[in-house]
C-alpha cells in the first residue's frame, strides 16, 4: 500500500506541474488564439478545483491500472501503459475535433504534450512501483 500511495502522490505532483508548465507556459499563446472556446480566466480559476480533481483521478487511475499487475511491472511497463492511455485520449480528441471548433494545431500540441506526460508518468510509477524481487536474489 505504501508504494501505491507514494506512486500516486509522485504521479499527481508531476501531472499538476506538467499541466501548468506545458499548457500554462509553453502553450499559453496557442490557447490565447482559441480563447473564445474557453471560460473566462476568472471563471476558470473559480473552478480550478475541478482541474485538480481531474488530475488526481488521472494519477489514481494510472496507478490503479499499473498496480493491478500491468505487464509484469517496471519502467518499461509504465511507459507502455502511458502510451496506451494517451492513444485512448488522442482518440477522444479526434471526436472533439470533429464535433467542436478546436483548432487542429491546439489538439495536436495537446496530444504531443499528453504523450510526454503519460510516458513520464509511466517512468515515475514504474520506478516507484517496480515488481518486488525474490528474496536472496
Where are these regions (language model features)?
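Juxtamembrane/disordered regions of integral membrane proteins
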Residues: 1-137
Amino acid at each position: 500500500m505504501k508504494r501505491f500511495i507514494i506512486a500516486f502522490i509522485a504521479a499527481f505532483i508531476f501531472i499538476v506541474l506538467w499541466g501548468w508548465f506545458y499548457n500554462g507556459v509553453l502553450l499559453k499563446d496557442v490557447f490565447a488564439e482559441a480563447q473564445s472556446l474557453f471560460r473566462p480566466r476568472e471563471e476558470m480559476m473559480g473552478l480550478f478545483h475541478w482541474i485538480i480533481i481531474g488530475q488526481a483521478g488521472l494519477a489514481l487511475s494510472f496507478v490503479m491500472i499499473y498496480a493491478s499487475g500491468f505487464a509484469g511491472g517496471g519502467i518499461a511497463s509504465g511507459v507502455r501503459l502511458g502510451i496506451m492511455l494517451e492513444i485512448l485520449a488522442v482518440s477522444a480528441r479526434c471526436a472533439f475535433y470533429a464535433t467542436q471548433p478546436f483548432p487542429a494545431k491546439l489538439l495536436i500540441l495537446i496530444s504531443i504534450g499528453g504523450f510526454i506526460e503519460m510516458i513520464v508518468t509511466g517512468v515515475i510509477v514504474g520506478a516507484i512501483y517496480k515488481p518486488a524481487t525474490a528474496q536472496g536474489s
